[in-house]
């Protein structure tokens, strides 16, 4: 179960459903890159993060696609699969998967505008957490841009349920998270986390959270062509 309280404003939303906030947009000071193995495909990939213009948002670019159609705007509307990884794609059928840790790092560092270049269909898994991506962003440096950040306006509670899983958004004058997981496995069992992500708490308290899985699922996943790049240095088993 998860509860997220999002920024709430009465100034009125624009056509995109977002409102201006007191904070300015941010991007990177300079390009930065890394390489690593992709969790599910098992291939070696290179990734770069590039500064982007105000209002351009987050954009993925497949550098291994020679013709047009290599750009994928990062948006919930472009999610094509969320089975064991988040995959987004465009109308040309070009996709990039396992983007969730990088997205968490960009959100946690309050980066609004960036171009993400990758030379394959999946981002590198690194150590299985968002922390290496936070380090990458800090290496690049963060610059404030001359335009207000725009945020989704939550006016009433919203809840999504899928079996025993649920996520709720609740109007608030602040921004906070409350998470709860409950597994039969005693090594994980029931855990809770409530946090207000300000003043570096994302980096210190959230970014190091790592992907975990169960040993009994590994053979089944690999038979299905998944977790081919999984290892004990990029996942907890």
Put a short name on every predicted segment.
Residues 1-21:
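N-terminal amphipathic/basic-hydrophobic helices that include classical n-h-c signal peptides
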Residues 14-112, 117-237:
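C-terminal regulatory domains involved in ligand/effector binding and gene-expression control
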């Amino acid at each position: 179960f998860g509860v997220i309280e999002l920024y709430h404003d009465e100034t009125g939303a624009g056509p995109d459903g977002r409102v201006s906030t007191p904070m300015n947009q941010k991007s990177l000071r300079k390009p930065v890159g890394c390489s690593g193995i992709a969790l599910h495909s098992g291939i070696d990939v290179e990734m770069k993060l590039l500064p982007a213009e105000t209002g351009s948002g987050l954009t993925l670019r497949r550098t291994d696609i020679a013709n047009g159609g290599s750009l994928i705007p990062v948006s919930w509307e472009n999610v094509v699969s969320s089975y064991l990884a988040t995959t987004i794609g465009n109308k040309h059928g070009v996709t990039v998967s396992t983007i969730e840790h990088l997205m968490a790092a960009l959100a946690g560092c309050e980066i609004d505008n960036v171009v993400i270049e990758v030379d394959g269909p999946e981002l590198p898994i690194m150590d299985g957490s968002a922390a290496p991506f936070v380090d990458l962003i800090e290496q690049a440096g963060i610059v404030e841009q001359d335009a207000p950040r725009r945020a989704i306006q939550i006016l009433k509670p919203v809840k999504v349920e899928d079996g025993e899983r649920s996520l709720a958004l609740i109007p608030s004058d602040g921004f906070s998270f409350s998470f709860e997981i409950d597994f039969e496995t005693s090594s994980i069992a029931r855990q809770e986390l409530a946090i207000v992500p300000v003043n570096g708490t994302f980096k210190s308290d959230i970014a190091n959270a790592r992907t975990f899985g169960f040993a009994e699922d590994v053979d089944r996943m690999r038979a299905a062509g998944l977790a081919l790049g999984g290892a004990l240095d990029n996942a907890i088993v």
